[in-house]
Regions:
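Periplasmic/extracellular electron-transfer cofactor-ligation site
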Residues: 47, 53-102, 113-129, 155-168, ...
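C-terminal capping alpha-helices of c-type cytochrome domains
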Residues: 129-169, 242-270
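Post-signal peptide N-terminal segment of mature Sec-exported envelope proteins
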Residues: 28-54
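Amphipathic alpha-helical transducer elements in NTP-driven molecular machines
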Residues: 101-109, 247-250
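Bacterial N-terminal signal peptides that target proteins for export
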Residues: 1-11
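Bacterial signal peptide processing site
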Residues: 21-24
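Predominantly soluble domains enriched in secretory-pathway, periplasmic, or organellar proteins
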Residues: 173-181, 201, 225-226, 230, ...
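Bacterial N-terminal signal peptides
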Residues: 10-18
Length: 689
């Protein structure tokens, strides 16, 4: 493994990327024009101000920056430009400054034409990233426009001054850009596949911001294209820079986002049952495992762009079976016995795989949503009945409902809508999506998180056709989470609320709302014992370069219970998953959605005995993104996915297996098609993380 070298983090300094941002390959290298002699600051004249305003609008600068006096310039990706000129002198004198400018004019010019020469330390309270702003910005500005922008930033209008010109906050619907039928159909499909998970099917926002026309029209095609191409430091992928989309495709998406979102159809029970297939009936399945392999150490691996999962032998690293599943599988959950793997695709197709067969085989499937993220099974076995392997539940993004199914055949039994009212403003929400679901050991209950309205539902499945539901008030934008080490308390991130909600599954009540850094994204989290604070549960973040650890021991360490007791800094934000094991001395974390490609493929480990900073970080690959960790059943190995590009032979993806004790690489499982999540049978059944 290569040693990690310090990677400068921060944000772009200057303006948003202009029209040339996504055409880097088409334009010659930018050279910095000589800075003119600095003139005394004076009020911006109307013609110069109008020219600057036109330049800001031309480039969609307000998509990334707050710019005083510029209508709708309220972006938060880049730094606030309100006082950039006033702070230039102090910055240039700082030892951290890496540029060459000696005057304010030269500083602003450098920031526009050579944005990575110096990366500012702060972007609206978050660490910012190198490489977000393209140097090809200068190609889109004439010398007159550049001079006007510099003059404007040196003397922007005050709070009480009128803006130079006005425009409506949102353009009328009939002013939205046009799309051909072919373009509209393509953009609609791509939005569902790549964007709806964070921004919502109706584009009302969740993990990502709302993309309704009242928001997007103000940014315009160029501003939207800038963000789509470059991504953001808060977790949005850089679709253009990665090569997922061409400039022409990005332009189509930007125009699509300024139109009203198309209304998706509902999915009634009749249509669900029409999609239901049982390929091997329960009485035709084996009574005992037919394989000599250690099936409890199988890994079920998502092959995202192949529409498959690979079942890999954790002892031999062999691919035992590739099984067709739904599109872009989000998660796999095991039945309570571990025999069956329930695989949910983002297209709402649920596949059931029998791991006892000599070759793991799909035995049933059904589609209960058009967009989904979660599946869980019934696990309770106690005084109120034995529900082992009897039921399953799928949580849908669209339509907003969950569906209870027969756990042996996947026959749909009952549908429950999640439409309702938000916990904070009590406003009706038409699209409250179902996020994570976990199964309680204390009751025949599922804990179902209803994202947009901020409610946690305790769903009693003892009577699956008439489930009893207790609604707990938490915080909006609930997403993913997991159990504490005792499996009594469930912790779930309300990511855009910057909180973690805590539920006591034994008593069926809310315990706490814990404030965290920006946009917590724990996956299932990581349970470990902090040397100072005792048992904790930890999460990474999309919006901040940090790990938060929350005390989880109200009996042994009551002073620290349900408080954020430690924040461990990371080299970058964009973390999706964190993982540990009771037998390990390490905590592993990724930065998958960081806009810096080096950080996106970098993984870090934190020593439990010294959790104040990363023990070491390294690049796991020379391409793609490092994502998601999973231990083998013994807790001696860690598997990490290299999420590649299905269109690039040799770089489609692989899994890297590390020795957990020494952090040394053991083996690579190559030539997998965009592997992402991995689910070890034993660890998934027993909720070990």
């Amino acid at each position: 493994m290569r040693p990690w070298k310090h990677i400068v983090t921060g944000a772009m300094l200057g303006l948003a990327v202009l029209i040339g941002c996504a055409r880097q390959a088409e334009t010659p290298p930018t050279t910095t024009a000589p800075a003119p002699q600095e003139a005394p600051v004076s009020a911006t004249t109307a013609p110069a101000g109008d020219l600057a305003l036109a330049a800001f609008k031309k480039g969609g600068c307000g998509a990334c920056h707050i710019i005083p006096g510029v209508p709708n310039a309220r972006g938060t990706i880049g730094p606030d430009l309100t006082n950039i000129a006033q702070g230039a002198a102090q910055t240039m004198q700082s030892s951290a400054y890496t540029g060459k400018a000696t005057t304010v004019d030269a500083y602003l010019r450098e920031a526009i034409l050579e944005p990575d020469v110096f990366v500012a330390p702060d972007c609206n309270g978050s660490s910012c990233q190198k490489g977000i702003m393209s140097p090809s910005l200068g190609q889109g500005l004439s010398e007159e426009e550049l001079a006007a922008v510099i003059t404007y930033l040196k003397n922007p209008p005050g709070e009480t001054e009128a803006v130079i010109s006005e425009e409506p906050a949102a353009a009328p619907a009939d002013a939205a850009p046009t799309l051909s039928d072919e373009e509209f159909a393509w953009a609609k499909l791509v939005y569902f596949e790549r964007c709806a998970g964070c921004h919502g099917t109706l584009r009302k926002g969740a993990t990502g911001p709302a993309l309704t026309p009242d928001k997007t029209m103000a940014l315009g095609t160029v501003g939207l294209s800038t963000i789509i191409y470059n991504g953001t430091p808060r977790g949005m992928p850089d679709w253009g820079k990665q090569g997922f989309f061409t400039q022409e495709q990005i332009d189509v998406l930007a125009r699509f986002l300024q139109r009203e979102p198309p209304a998706p159809p509902e999915l009634p029970m009749e249509r669900m049952k029409a999609s239901w297939n049982v390929y091997v009936a329960p009485d035709q399945r084996p009574d005992t495992p037919q394989t000599t392999r250690n099936w409890q150490n199988y890994f079920v691996v998502t092959l995202r762009d192949a529409g498959q999962v690979a079942v890999i032998d954790g002892d031999t690293y062999e691919v035992v079976s590739n099984v067709d599943s739904g599109y872009a599988v989000h998660i796999t959950r095991m039945s309570a016995t571990g025999r069956y793997a329930y695989v949910i695709g983002r297209d709402g197709k649920l596949a059931m795989i029998d791991l006892w067969m000599e070759t793991p085989t799909k035995v049933a499937e059904v589609q209960v949503c058009y967009d989904a993220r979660s599946v869980e099974v019934s696990k309770y076995n106690g005084p109120k009945g034995d529900f082992t392997d009897k039921l399953a539940v799928v949580g849908c993004y669209w339509p907003p409902h969950f569906v209870i199914l027969d756990g042996q055949t996947l026959e749909p039994i009952h549908i429950v809508s999640t439409r309702g009212y938000t916990v904070d403003t009590m406003e009706y929400h038409p699209e409250p999506r179902v996020a994570s679901i976990v199964a309680s050991d204390f009751q025949p209950e599922w804990i179902i998180n209803v994202k947009e309205i901020g409610q946690i539902w305790l769903v009693n499945y003892a009577d699956p056709k008439a489930p009893q539901i207790k609604m707990l008030q938490a915080a909006r934008f609930l997403h993913d989470g997991g159990w504490d080490a005792t499996h009594r308390y469930f912790l779930v991130a309300a990511n855009q609320s910057n909180k973690v909600a805590v539920v006591d599954a034994q008593e069926g009540r809310m315990v706490a709302l814990v404030h965290t850094p920006k946009i917590p994204h724990p996956g299932r989290g990581a349970n470990w014992v902090d040397p100072e604070f005792g048992p904790v549960w930890s999460s990474g973040h999309l919006g901040d370069p940090a790990i938060v650890s929350i005390g989880t021991d109200p009996e042994g360490h009551p002073d620290y219970a349900w408080k954020a007791v430690r924040v461990t800094p990371l080299p970058g934000a964009g973390s999706l998953f964190i993982k540990t094991h009771p037998n390990s001395k390490w905590i592993w974390i990724d930065m998958t959605l960081n806009s810096d490609p080096v950080l996106a493929r970098t993984i870090c480990v934190i020593a439990k005995e010294n959790p104040t900073e990363p023990h070491t970080c390294w690049e796991a690959s020379t391409y793609g993104r490092a994502v998601h960790f999973e231990y083998n059943a013994a807790g001696t190995e860690v598997w990490v996915s290299i999420w590649g590009d299905a269109s690039k032979p040799g770089e489609t993806g692989e899994i890297v297996v590390y020795d957990d004790a020494t952090l040394t690489e053991k083996v690579r499982i190559p030539n997998l098609v965009t592997p992402t999540g991995k689910f070890n049978v034993y660890n998934t059944v027993h909720d070990i993380y």
